[in-house]
A protein has these predicted regions:
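Nucleotide/phosphate-binding catalytic cleft detector across ATP-hydrolyzing
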Residues: 1-61, 76-83, 89, 94-149, ...
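Short, glycine/acidic-enriched loop or turn micro-motifs at the edges of active sites
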Residues: 46, 66-67
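Short beta-strand scaffold segments in enzyme catalytic cores
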Residues: 69-73
Length: 243
């Protein structure tokens, strides 16, 4: 009872007129109904708390889920910019299905079958194994293409949001971009990301781009770190009052 429970919520989307307040409030009521103190944290910020620990919590965190992608620009543990876009893994599946005439369920199955696809190989290379049918080849090429489109969409919006933000801190050193979520776990993802990333057009110098370790659970671990920090601060506050 009265322990801290941190739960993640998406940041406000920039490409769709919708809010997340209702869902946040529903989650809060459920959690508090079990006797916990509910504390929300934005999804990409939670990812940053796990993936940017070795860089003084400074850098860019991108959480790529099925329905949305969340982005946070962090400086010394503080969020300088957060937003989301309403595209993710489902968007890839839907567009590949529309272009190839294959069902969305089958596209998802092919995309998540590690032995079938490697995005690190170019479209003109053999990204599929021997015995792959023509239909499956078309699906695999379309998956790679739409991964590139999604990543480009993320980077373009990040650049626009960064340049339009007020009071953005100066970053004295090159920063990492860390990525988490199920949509980034396909083999060869980083290769496609690097193809779309253009340092000359990006607003700050980037020293590395990597997928966070244990990507599926990274956000949960970030939520736990935030909960422990809140409890520690509350304990210190109580000790100060007693003195």
């Amino acid at each position: 009872k009265d322990e801290i429970c941190t739960y993640c919520v998406p940041s406000a989307p920039i490409d769709q007129d919708r809010r997340v307040d209702y869902h946040e409030d529903v989650l809060k009521q459920i959690i508090e109904g079990y006797g916990y103190k509910a504390r929300p944290i934005e999804e990409a910020v939670a990812l940053a708390y796990e993936g940017l620990v070795d860089n003084n919590l400074t850098g860019i965190a991108i959480s790529m889920g099925a329905g949305m992608c969340n982005i946070a620009v962090m400086y010394a543990g503080m969020s300088a910019l957060t937003f989301s876009v309403t595209r993710g893994g489902d968007w890839i599946d839907e567009n590949v299905a529309n272009d190839t005439g294959v069902s969305k369920a089958k596209v998802q199955n092919i995309k998540e079958s590690a032995q079938l696809i490697d995005l690190s190989k170019g479209v003109q290379d053999d990204i599929y194994g021997e015995g792959t049918g023509e239909e499956q080849k078309n699906v695999l090429h379309a998956i790679r293409s739409y991964y590139g489109v999604l990543i480009n969409y993320l980077l373009t919006n990040l650049q626009h949001q960064f340049e339009g933000a007020d009071k953005m801190p100066n970053f004295p050193d090159d920063v990492p971009i860390i990525i988490g979520g199920g949509t980034c776990l396909i083999k060869g993802f980083i290769d496609v990301f690097n193809e779309q990333f253009d340092q000359e057009k990006f607003p700050i110098p980037v020293k590395e781009i990597k997928i966070v370790e244990d990507s599926h659970t990274a956000i949960s671990r970030g939520c736990l770190s935030e909960a422990l920090l809140i409890e520690e601060e509350e304990d210190e506050s109580e000790e100060t009052k007693e003195k």
